[in-house]
Amino acid sequence: MLHISNDNYFEWRFGNIYYTKKGTGSPILLIHDTLPGASGYEWSKIEDELAIDHTVYTVDLLGCGRSDKSSITYTNFVYVQMISDFIKKIIGQKTDVIASGFSGSFVTMACHNEKELFNKIMLVNPPSLTQLKQMPNRKDRLLKAALEIPIFGTLVYHMIVSRDNINNLFIEKMYYNPFHVDNQMSDAYYEAAHKGGYYTRFLYSSLAAKYININICHALKALDNSIYIVEGETEPNGKAVTDDYCASNPAIEVSVLKETKHLPHVEAPEAFLEQVKIFF
């Protein structure tokens, strides 16, 4: 499923970043979630339609999909720098951004650090502000060390991203209607989760041990960009999460897509595109 259609790699300091570029017009950068197996394929149902009016850049984050799976400790700041450098060196101008899930925290911090790079921002089911405040403790650090042990860590990681567990992830957490799960999408997640061999476990170990968490409240309050949140109707605690974001920054607008969960742009691409056209 994860075809490499061209040689579009951004040579970055921590590894090569795979991306695609489609269409012409004002730029939009699409950034996928950080769940195990996530990649730019997450946007496959909407990127061609967006490319009619925009230049659409879709990236595979470092450690994900077709990008390098570097054996580093992944932190929020690593992705903040990656996104900012990508905009500066590849897009080359101020850009709109749509970020899914946990990646919304990267975009928020990147915009806070270098606001001249960002225009409008759309966050799709962003992470809980309370969750983001949780920092690694001793138990988390031990977990990370265990997951990075060559044989043991690889075995545990492969159990976590087994075919059955990926399918269960979609059925239980990603889709409003489990009978409508897109098999091609779950296949792409499974492929991405195993691409890169045993190095794939390093991103998961950093995620599981909370190394990617960061308190974004101060950044969110300071932003004066137009920010729009798209929430899946049945996303767990979705209303509480968006209420917290709006309390931090009252200028934020929110739209709820009916009969969707964690991936509204996959479950209801037409309804999602309507929101994109309204906002951008």
Model-derived segments and their meaning:
Residues H32, A99-G104:
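Conserved alpha/beta-hydrolase "nucleophile elbow" surrounding the catalytic nucleophile
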Residues G104-K115, I121:
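Short glycine-enriched nucleophile-adjacent loop
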Residues Y18-R66:
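Conserved HGGG/HGGXW glycine-rich cap/lid loop of the alpha/beta-hydrolase fold
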Residues H112, K120-T154:
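Flexible "cap/lid" loop of the alpha/beta hydrolase fold
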Residues T58-I98, E274:
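Active-site loop/oxyanion-hole signature of alpha/beta-hydrolase fold enzymes
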Residues L132-K133, H158-A219:
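Conserved alpha/beta-hydrolase catalytic His-Asp/Glu region
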Residues A222-T260:
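Conserved loop-alpha-helix segment in the C-terminal half of the alpha/beta-hydrolase fold
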Residues T260-L273:
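Catalytic histidine-centered segment of alpha/beta-hydrolase-like enzymes
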